[in-house]
């Protein structure tokens, strides 16, 4: 037992899955032999992992280990980098998302992403939430109103903003803006929600609210989170993947990884010997 490891939220340890042998019904994403290069530099090397449905999976590791790079692969954000080249597969519903036939815009509707810093649009709170729906051609006001309330409730923000929906989103606090961005993401009903260090720019109170929200979100979505904060990973995730220098070193249920890791590199990292 590693006594200085982060304390794991025991509420997330009730269901322990065999991550190497998930059934089709249990699997949200399959990552197979994934390599990523920026020019001649290899940033990810032979990453293999299965991400379960309806749970929270955390990617941890020191700066530059490849965790955010891997996260961005899941909705092809790395396509925006000209010198990026990817080999291997990421399967969603059994289809490789990097197949030429894949509609990338449709993929990103199905795999939403929230970044480190809140990025509300220069619009009202209401228009931020319905932005994706309007892009899909939805105009029915009753439908839009329903989605706004459902999404803001889902992001634990409704009670705070229901009387000022037509005010600028820039009038919200940082924590509220991040929850608004989450509401905007879930308004179009993605299957998977990617969170790239979603609390790194927030104060401790706002961070706690977001962490509680993450635990609620997994009842409807598969959540994958990148975090530098090991304590946060221990609090919110069901599974944790430890990455180092572009390689997946260890991947298991969060309780096992933080209390009885199998790899020396993992133990050294979570006990603070490097990082």
Swiss-Prot record:
- Return any one Pfam family short name: ABC_tran
Question: GO MF annotations for this entry?
Answer: ATP binding; ATP hydrolysis activity; ATPase-coupled phosphate ion transmembrane transporter activity
Which keywords belong to this entry? ATP-binding, Cell inner membrane, Cell membrane, Membrane, Nucleotide-binding, Phosphate transport, Translocase, Transport
**Chain positions recorded as ATP binding sites:** 61-68
Q: What is its EC number?
A: 7.3.2.1
Q: What is its main location?
A: membrane
Entry's Gene Ontology cellular component terms:
plasma membrane
Cellular compartment(s):
Cell inner membrane
- Which intervals hold domain ABC transporter? 29-270
Q: Entry's PROSITE patterns?
A: ABC_TRANSPORTER_1, ABC_TRANSPORTER_2, PSTB
Q: Name one GO biological process term.
A: phosphate ion transmembrane transport
Q: Which reaction does it catalyse?
A: phosphate(out) + ATP + H2O = ADP + 2 phosphate(in) + H(+)
Kindly give the membrane topology term recorded for this protein: Peripheral membrane protein
Gene3D superfamilies of this UniProt entry?
P-loop containing nucleotide triphosphate hydrolases (3.40.50.300)
Q: Which InterPro entries match?
A: AAA+_ATPase, ABC_transporter-like_ATP-bd, ABC_transporter-like_CS, P-loop_NTPase, PstB-like
Query: Domain of life, per the record?
Result: Bacteria
Q: What family does the entry list? A: Belongs to the ABC transporter superfamily. Phosphate importer (TC 3.A.1.7) family.
Q: PANTHER family per the record?
A: ABC TRANSPORTER I FAMILY MEMBER 17, IRON EXPORT ATP-BINDING PROTEIN FETA-RELATED
Query: In UniProt terms, what function does this protein have?
Result: Part of the ABC transporter complex PstSACB involved in phosphate import. Responsible for energy coupling to the transport system.
How the protein assembles, per its UniProt entry? The complex is composed of two ATP-binding proteins (PstB), two transmembrane proteins (PstC and PstA) and a solute-binding protein (PstS).
The name under which this protein is listed is: Phosphate import ATP-binding protein PstB
Q: Can you name the source organism?
A: Pseudoalteromonas translucida (strain TAC 125)
Q: What is the lineage of its organism?
A: Bacteria, Pseudomonadati, Pseudomonadota, Gammaproteobacteria, Alteromonadales
Q: Identify the coding gene.
A: pstB
């Amino acid at each position: 037992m590693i006594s200085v490891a982060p304390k794991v939220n025991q509420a997330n340890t009730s269901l322990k899955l065999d991550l190497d042998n998930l059934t089709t019904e249990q699997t949200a994403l399959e990552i197979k032999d994934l390599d990523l290069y920026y020019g001649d530099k290899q940033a990810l090397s032979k990453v293999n992992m299965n991400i379960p449905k309806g749970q929270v999976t955390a990617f941890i590791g020191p700066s530059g280990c490849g965790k955010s790079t891997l996260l961005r692969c899941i909705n092809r954000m790395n396509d925006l980098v000209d010198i990026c080249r990817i080999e291997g597969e990421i399967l969603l519903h059994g289809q490789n998302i990097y197949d030429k036939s894949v509609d990338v815009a449709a993929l990103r509707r199905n795999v939403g992403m929230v970044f480190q810093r809140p990025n509300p649009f220069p619009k009202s709170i209401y228009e931020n939430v319905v932005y994706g729906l309007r892009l899909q051609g939805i105009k029915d006001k009753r439908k839009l109103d329903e989605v706004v309330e459902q999404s803001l409730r889902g992001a634990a923000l409704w009670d705070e903003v229901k009387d000022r929906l037509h005010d600028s989103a820039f009038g919200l606090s940082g924590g509220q803006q991040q929850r608004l961005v989450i509401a905007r993401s879930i308004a179009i009903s993605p299957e998977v929600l990617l969170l790239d260090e979603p609390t790194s720019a927030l104060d401790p109170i706002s961070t706690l609210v977001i962490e509680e929200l993450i635990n609620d979100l997994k009842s409807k979505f598969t959540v994958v989170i990148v975090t530098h904060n090991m304590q946060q990973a221990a609090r919110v995730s069901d599974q944790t993947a430890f990455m180092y220098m572009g390689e997946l070193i260890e991947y298991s249920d969060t309780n096992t990884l933080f209390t009885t890791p199998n790899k020396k590199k993992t133990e050294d990292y979570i006990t603070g010997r490097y990082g």
